[in-house]
């Protein structure tokens, strides 16, 4: 190599290095903006560290300090059930019953427009990034713009989820769910955190008991008998907000989801065969392979004079193909079972989830106002006294009453319920408000006698 050629190659190398730095520099100028765009997302590196801590534990049964991490705030009665209970206990006379029903109608009327406006704002924020939009396509967004819009939607969702009495699941809880698998869950999945930008879970309605059959995964069969359903910790509703690096924001709601099965709800996962099942399948392959080799291989070896090395090679290829087919069929069956389970668990997705959350928040708002109205009416001093003292009294009374009626420990937000009640007080008695348009009564529909069809006389 001459000096001239070496200098020429070196110059090309420096030029290529300069171009490469320029290209990567343009990318680096974009991606450092992601932390600012994402706001405070879940630190997936911290999540991975917590998962490592749970892997070192021996058979953990629940997340650490679970009673402090998760507080149930969902009122486990529908509005109609709550009205009947309040009427039976506090408003038994006809006049009191009519007054409570009128108050309930007034709350419904006032909250309807409030949550309709919230839903309209949410849908306007979500529409540019809605993957299920049925209208004409809008100009495509860049990845940083899409991430910024997604974080804006999530920030707007937080107060609505709080009013709907969803509790956010902590990073420690998610680490437990990603590591620990229930022994009766035959379908297990593997999640690669490197594929995700953020993962958020909210839940309500914690229960401990036997899960509904269609929401379960696995056949629950032992070696010789069918195992009885185990009691598990699960949630009546779970909301997921997740984003993969190559995808978009996924908003989904599920019902009857066990704590150890949260990872099954994520959009990017791989079905894997549990260790015990893999060991059993391998044992079956070895036993059947030895039997085939003894019965068939020895005959081929002696009668056809095939070399031992060639016979072993053919046998290894045969067993490898058989093992690959068996494990592939097993994974396909498990993937189908997981798909069937998610079909029954899924309740709403993306834009429909926003509407469902607005309705649920309105319902919880009404129930909190009804409880505050009924309990403060029987308090000796009413709303007299400091707001802090009143809210503490209201919280204690309502929590004890809900525990006695439902058997569930519910954390009641007395301060928020008082605020709901006080916001309604100035307009009480104005239902419907002055100037509200009234619909004309529906005219009764009378059935007209069928007209006789003209008949032609045939002579």
UniProtKB/Swiss-Prot annotation:
Residue ranges crossing the lipid bilayer per the database entry: 280-300, 301-321
Taxonomic source organism: Homo sapiens (Human)
Record carries keyword Membrane: yes
Pfam families membership: DUF3754
Location within or outside the cell: Membrane
Superkingdom of the organism of origin: Eukaryota
Principal place of residence: membrane
Keyword set, alphabetical order: Membrane, Phosphoprotein, Transmembrane, Transmembrane helix
Entry's Gene Ontology cellular component terms: membrane; mitochondrion
Region (Disordered) location: 435-459
Modified positions (Phosphoserine) in chain numbering: 332
Cited InterPro entries: DUF3754
Name by which UniProt lists this protein: Transmembrane protein 143
Biased amino acid composition, Polar residues: 448-459
Membrane topology: Multi-pass membrane protein
């Amino acid at each position: 190599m001459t000096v001239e050629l070496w200098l020429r190659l070196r110059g090309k190398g420096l030029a290529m290095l300069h171009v490469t730095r320029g290209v990567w520099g343009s990318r680096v100028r974009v991606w450092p903006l992601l932390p600012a765009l994402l706001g405070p997302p879940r630190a997936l590196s911290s999540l991975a560290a917590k998962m490592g801590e749970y892997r070192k534990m021996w058979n953990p049964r629940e997340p650490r300090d679970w009673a402090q991490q998760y507080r149930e705030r969902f009122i486990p009665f529908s509005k109609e059930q709550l009205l009947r209970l309040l009427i039976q206990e506090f408003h038994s006379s006809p006049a009191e019953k009519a007054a409570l029903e009128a108050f309930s109608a007034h709350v419904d009327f006032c909250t309807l427009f409030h949550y309709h406006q919230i839903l309209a704002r949410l849908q306007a924020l979500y529409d540019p990034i809605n993957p299920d939009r049925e209208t004409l396509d809008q100009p495509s967004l860049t990845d940083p713009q899409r991430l910024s819009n997604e974080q804006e939607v999530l920030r707007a969702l937080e107060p609505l989820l709080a009013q709907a009495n969803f509790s956010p699941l902590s990073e420690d809880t998610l680490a437990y769910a990603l590591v620990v698998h229930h022994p009766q869950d035959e379908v297990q999945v593997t999640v690669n955190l490197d594929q995700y930008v953020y993962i958020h879970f909210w839940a309500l309605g914690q229960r401990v008991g036997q899960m509904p059959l269609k929401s379960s995964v696995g056949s629950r069969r032992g070696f010789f008998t069918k195992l009885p359903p185990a009691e598990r910790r699960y949630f009546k509703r779970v909301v997921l907000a997740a984003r993969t690096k190559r995808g978009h924001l996924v908003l989904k709601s599920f019902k009857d989801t066990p704590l150890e099965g949260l990872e099954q709800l994520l959009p990017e996962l791989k079905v894997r065969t549990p260790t015990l099942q893999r060991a059993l399948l391998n044992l079956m392959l070895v036993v059947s392979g030895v039997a085939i080799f003894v019965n068939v291989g020895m005959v081929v070896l002696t009668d056809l004079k095939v070399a031992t090395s060639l016979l072993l090679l053919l046998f290894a290829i045969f067993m490898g193909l058989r093992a690959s087919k068996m494990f592939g069929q097993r994974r396909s069956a498990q993937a189908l079972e997981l798909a069937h389970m998610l079909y029954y668990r899924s309740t709403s997705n993306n834009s429909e989830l926003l509407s469902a959350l607005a309705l649920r928040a309105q319902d919880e708002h009404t129930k909190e106002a009804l409880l505050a109205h009924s309990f403060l009416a029987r308090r000796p001093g009413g709303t007299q006294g400091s707001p802090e003292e009143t809210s503490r009294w209201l919280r204690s009374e309502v929590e004890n009453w809900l525990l006695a009626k439902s058997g569930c420990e519910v954390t009641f937000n007395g301060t928020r319920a008082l605020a709901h009640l006080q916001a309604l007080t100035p307009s009480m008695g104005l239902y419907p408000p002055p100037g509200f348009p009234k619909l004309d009564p529906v005219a009764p529909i009378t059935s007209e006698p069928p007209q006789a069809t003209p008949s032609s006389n045939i002579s």
